[in-house]
């Protein structure tokens, strides 16, 4: 039996494929490579010494997707594929509803047709909106503030309705916080385009000289140093969280929602100083105006994942920094050969 990974060539998807292969799962990948690169999958095979089956397919193409289920004995699906830029979603919401929500409907329709009813869904902590208290538990009220987050919430609700209609489905919804770092080999990592939206690739691109300085958005928040605090989690810990959720999903018929985070927040300047300490480099920065909608502090309560999945984040901030820098140093131009720019794989 095989595990189908949608968006498996993306940042989180490729790291999860490594952990699946290391756990002796057979892996089948569907990816349209609109914001990922087949080279990532070549390197996954290089790291693990195992082969993976890859289909270059858009999830909206149900006929092609059916072929994947016809040609493979699929036991469960881990669903990463989707657009992920908050700013872009505000400018082009219809694109996000099509590529995130409609594509998931297409996927679930085909899954149901072929009686594959185990799915792990890659959601996001963006569904929580502005927290009133901390840490953030899974029972927090949902308050999405942009079309990207809205697609995640709508998919979560849709999956709940699917389960209510047919309790033979088993569904795990993973809400994770801020993945950073890279595989310790330095062969795969976050291959961002232009000026990154995320902190760590921004830092590494400044450190390597591709960008002039780091923009720190706001230094007057009510935090220890005035900069925003987030829950940063090593991407390999996050990948292992997906494997843990997969095991439970296959064993149980239920809907489970889990935060994946470290349970500790670090400020922007704390991450910057940790990176400088781990690499013996100095990263120039300037303070800019806060971004609209940003909150001061945001971190997870991951107790449920520990109790029910037996999962806990293990890697330190220092390891996250060292691994991210190793990836950037070994791959200054990312995976080099990009087919086209978009945002469809995690």
Where are these regions (language model features)?
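N-terminal Rossmann-like NAD(P)+-binding domain of SDR-like oxidoreductases, especially those catalyzing
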Residues: 1-182
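C-terminal substrate-binding subdomain of Rossmann-fold SDR/epimerase-dehydratase oxidoreductases
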Residues: 202-346
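Short, flexible, glycine-rich and Lys/Arg-enriched loop motifs at helix boundaries
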Residues: 38, 178-198, 209-230
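Short-chain dehydrogenase/reductase
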Residues: 97, 145-153, 189, 193-197, ...
């Amino acid at each position: 039996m095989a595990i189908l990974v949608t968006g498996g060539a993306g940042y989180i998807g490729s790291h999860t494929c490594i952990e699946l292969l290391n756990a002796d799962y057979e892996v089948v990948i569907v990816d349209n490579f609109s914001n990922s690169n087949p080279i990532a999958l070549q390197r996954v095979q290089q790291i693990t010494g195992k082969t993976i089956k890859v289909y270059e397919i858009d999830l909206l193409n149900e006929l092609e997707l059916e072929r994947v289920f016809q040609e493979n004995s699929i036991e469960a699906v881990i669903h990463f594929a989707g657009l992920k830029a908050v700013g872009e979603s505000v400018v082009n919401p219809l694109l996000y509803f099509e590529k995130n929500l409609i594509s998931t409907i297409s996927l679930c329709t085909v899954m149901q047709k072929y009686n594959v009813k185990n799915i792990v869904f890659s959601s996001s902590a963006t569904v929580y909106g502005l927290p009133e208290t901390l840490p953030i538990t899974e029972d927090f009220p949902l308050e999405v503030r942009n079309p990207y987050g809205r697609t995640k919430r709508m998919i979560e609700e849709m999956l709940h309705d699917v389960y209510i209609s047919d309790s033979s489905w088993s569904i795990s919804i993973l809400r994770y916080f801020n993945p950073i770092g890279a595989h310790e080999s330095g062969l795969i990592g976050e291959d961002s385009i232009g000026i990154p939206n995320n902190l760590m690739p921004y830092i590494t691109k400044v450190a390597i000289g591709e960008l002039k300085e780091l923009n720190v958005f706001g230094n007057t928040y009510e935090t220890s140093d005035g900069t925003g605090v987030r829950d940063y989690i090593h991407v390999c810990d996050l990948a292992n969280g997906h494997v843990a959720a997969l095991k439970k999903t296959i064993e149980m018929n239920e809907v489970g929602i889990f935060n994946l985070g470290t349970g500790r927040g670090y400020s922007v300047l704390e991450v910057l100083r940790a990176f400088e300490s781990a690499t013996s480099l100095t990263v120039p920065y300037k303070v800019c105006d806060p971004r609209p909608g940003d909150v001061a502090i945001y971190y997870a309560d991951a107790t449920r994942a520990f109790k029910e999945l037996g999962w806990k984040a293990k890697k330190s901030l220092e390891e996250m920094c060292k691994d991210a820098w190793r990836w950037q140093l070994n791959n200054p131009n990312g995976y080099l050969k990009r087919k086209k720019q978009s945002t469809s794989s995690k």
